[in-house]
Design a protein with these regions (language model features):
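Intracellular helix-loop hinge segments at the cytoplasmic ends of transmembrane helices
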Residues: 16, 100-111
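C-terminal transmembrane helical hairpin of 12-TM major facilitator-type secondary transporters
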Residues: 57-102
Length: 180
């Protein structure tokens, strides 16, 4: 839920932010919005290759979520073109690695041979709730504060909560596997 909320928040927030705050044209904002999309597509595939090397799902997911928080945290400094472009690429990398990890998570939790459709129900339920919540959170924070940067900081906090949840999940998985 929290990851998808920030994902949808990003892709609904970014074009409006670019037009309202950075004075881009609507067409320019759409073109810039494609940078993280292209990076995301590439890193979704790379994420699968990384998982096949034996890197654990929780490790990759924690890394991806940390990158995502970093991408959000760079937004207030994105007036500098290098930082702005870097934030788009960093966020795109994270947004590609994260869903790859999430789709691999059910087989990690219940075992690959038992990860049927019901194992994905939780992932999909969280995803769809996040699709609904992300744009509402972004709009709500902007309406409350009148400041788009507050939206970025809100999603840094959401990313932090997601990282904490992922680390807790990793600890629980390790404990279950060791019999504790």
């Amino acid at each position: 839920f929290l990851w998808q909320a920030q994902f949808m928040g990003y892709f609904t927030w970014l074009p409006v932010y670019l037009v309202d705050v950075r004075n881009f044209t609507a067409d320019g904002a759409v073109q810039i919005n494609q940078i993280p999309v292209v990076v995301l597509l590439v890193f979704s595939l790379i994420g699968g290759m990384i998982l096949k090397t034996g890197v654990g799902v929780v490790k990759l997911l924690t890394f991806a979520l940390t990158l995502q928080a970093l991408g959000w945290a760079m937004i207030p400094f994105a007036g500098d073109p290098i930082i702005g472009l870097t934030s788009l690429v960093v966020w795109g990398i994270a947004a590609g690695l994260t869903p790859t990890s999430l789709w691999a998570l059910p087989s990690t939790l219940v075992g690959g041979h038992r990860a049927g459709t019901d194992a994905f129900a939780v992932v999909l339920t969280g995803r769809y709730l996040g699709i609904l919540a992300g744009p509402l959170i972004a709009a709500g924070m902007f309406n409350w504060t009148g400041d788009w940067i507050t939206v970025a900081y809100t999603f840094v906090a959401i990313a932090g909560a997601t990282i904490i949840g992922t680390l807790y999940l990793g600890t629980r998985i390790r404990d279950l596997k060791s019999g504790n």
